[in-house]
Amino acid sequence: GAAWRVKDLTLTPSPYLKGYLDEFLQDTRLSPLTETNRGCPFECTFCVDGVGSRQKIFKSSHDRVKAELIYIASKTRSKYLQLADVNFGMFPEDIEFSKLFSKIKNEYDFPHHIQVCAGKNNQERIIKCGEILDGSLRFGASIQSMDDEVLKNIKRSNISYEKLIEVSKRVSNTEASTYSEVI
């Protein structure tokens, strides 16, 4: 049967808020990792997030993310934050999370850089998140192949080359950095 999943992410105790990761937060070679949501609506064949049991998106609460970020910001020696979200900018809540990250940065001087995989289907929201975060955001866009037959067989569609360049240019105007990768 389908794998069981936690539907309410706030029911899982935060390892940050429990203090379990304090020693790692002091190591400048490491970056804290958190998430605002879990799951992916797409079905890419070779992606663990594309399997049927993970297709439903479960979101964390604003209060939980805020508490974790304040805790991390007060303990970490890193300037980087990794977000495990696989489609950041896809959901309306991502605007609110971007505002939260910006507020935390202004109050705690953290995070200077946020690494996240951006959603490809809502370019305006992605750009808005970049504007709110004023240079802190590092957006990644991934492709698995440039061959249409391969993409069909693996149930994936890429953002068009033209759109990728357009979004990269527009995001660059927000002072966010971008990167792409072949996965």
Would you name each region that the model predicts?
Residues P13-T174:
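Radical SAM [4Fe-4S] cluster-binding motif and immediate context
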Residues G1-D8:
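Glycine-rich beta-alpha loop elements in corrinoid/cobalamin-binding modules
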